[in-house]
Amino acid sequence: MTIVGISHGYPPLWNMGGEVSLHRTLASLKEEVVVLTSTEKDYSFEGVKVKQVNTPNVLNINSSPGPIAEQLKQLNARVVIGQSELSLPAVLAARAAGAISIINVHAPPKYGRSIRQAVIQADYAIYNTEASAKEWGEPNAIVLHPPISKIPNSISTNGDAYTVLSSLLNKGINVVIELAKRYPNKRFIVVRSPAEPTHGLADLEEIASEIPNLELHPRVPPEEVYKYFEQTRILLVPSRYETYGMSAIEAAGYGIPCVHVDTPHVREGIGEAAVLVSPSVEETARGIELIESNYQAYSEAARARAEWLQDRQSQELEKFEDFIANVQRPTNRSLRQTSVTKATRKTG
């Protein structure tokens, strides 16, 4: 029997937080794992087999589940874990193939309207934070905080840059641009996002060319992000919203402090080991000044938090593995359907 993940994209080609989190979760399982996704050819990545999903449009949540169900039957799927745009097709295909369906939920209902029907109809949902589980109406559901990469053996705080790991508008690129103008003697690194053409600034390169201390750098695979962390003094995450904040935790492993937008979900991750702010220029600047006023203390707090989170992660992955190994089809799916429906009625 096989565990099958279904996602619109998958590492190493798709390296956004949701895809990376799904991969690290699936890679932790001892059973055979296959992922169906958008890919030109089949491949294997860190022990996970990856195949082309049989659907013409991986970004269409209303894609026909029939062809996917046939794939699941061929793979002898026991459990199907779907997320994002392919969440509903994954649930319906799993049902047709006689497999158990699980939705990997990494956003609160406000930002997850498109997957609402999938969450309602699935056999189970797994949430990325306790706050998210409560907002979806399942406070007792399984919570698996997004796994981070192994933290380094020692800290590295010799960098000089204020770094933001995304160039998108919703990640606060405008805030960072204004900060670079405010601190002309400080180095700023902006790591570009592949979604920049649709969700970024059309004239970012022109803007950066007029700000000498603002550097644009290419996106790298998760295993190479250390190249930027080694150059970073403070990580900046002035996003409009964050549903967890993996990058801050990854940076914390290096002893790099962070100025981070404050949300209930972020508090379950980096939490108060970062300076939590509203996503504005003034608040982010205040956060920078606070860290610089006592850098060593903030660095040590960041590293300590990363170590604690890594221990929690090990425990959660063990529980998740045990759950997958023993999961059975629910005897009464309607109980969670009713709970999720009521909790998310206003966002549906």
Predicted regions and their residues:
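Short His-centered aromatic/hydrophobic patch
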Residues: 82-87, 105
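Aromatic "clamp/platform" in nucleotide-sugar-dependent glycosyltransferases that forms part
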Residues: 240
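Short hydrophobic beta-strand element within catalytic cores of glycosyltransferases
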Residues: 257-260
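Conserved acidic donor-binding segment of nucleotide-sugar-dependent glycosyltransferases
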Residues: 274-282, 289-295
